[in-house]
Amino acid sequence: MLRLERKWDRRVEGWHSHVTSAAAFEQVLGRLIRLAAPEPTDTCVDLGAGTGFVTTALAPLVSSVMAVDISAAMTASLAGRAARDGLRNVSTSVCDLRKFDLAPASADLVVSSYALHHLPDPDKRALVARVARWLRPGGRLVIADMMFGRGGSGRDREILRQKVVALAAKGPGGWWRIAKNLTRYGLGVGTEHPATPEFWQSALRDAEFSDVVFRPVVAEAGLVYGMRPGI
């Protein structure tokens, strides 16, 4: 994982503007916040927080946010941004999400935006199971991510078609990315492992979350929500 950490450390410069300038960014962030329904008393965790675009949006609305990321450079950038914005209720943790853990019943809200597709499916399930232990009764998990499969559904095929069309429009550089991505897709290699909405809903239900729902946002972007029962 040191290699992955270094990869994200190298990408920190310009990453915040890269993410926030994406066409669907505002839609995904807005829908995530609304679905999470943050409360002023909530203790929150942002998994794969990057430079903090979700953390800093949540912080004014809750009691505290812990931002977790594998990259020390990303979390340092996040901490600096929070300090400049006067957000004193933000803390950071540099950790591989596959190893990160918290005390049972210590959080009210756990969120993640466009991070968990970097985990293989068994690690996604293991993380969801740990999150279920972290949450107090009534606590919520909200995941925003690319949510599609390998062409098994009409939605999958339309998402893949849109991606190919968008890349082809970029000219030779886009054609190269199409060839590279098709090779990785066919061989099942690379660092991105998007999962279907059905996978995510199954993972949450298997971890005994209740009220599990999927909400499409735009293109491949989707949200999955679940609540820890017991209120």
Predicted regions, residues:
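Conserved class I S-adenosyl-L-methionine
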Residues: 1-39, 42-48, 54
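Class I SAM-dependent methyltransferase SAM/SAH-binding core
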Residues: 51-99
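A short acidic, Gly/Pro-enriched loop at the edge of an enzyme's catalytic core
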Residues: 102-109
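A short SAM/SAH-binding and catalytic strip from SAM-dependent methyltransferases
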Residues: 109-122
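A short glycine-rich, Lys/Arg-flanked "PGG" loop and its adjoining helix->strand segment in the class I
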Residues: 125-137
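C-terminal alpha-helical "lid/dimerization" subdomain adjacent to the S-adenosyl-L-methionine
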Residues: 144-206, 213-214
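Core SAM-dependent methyltransferase catalytic element
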Residues: 208-231
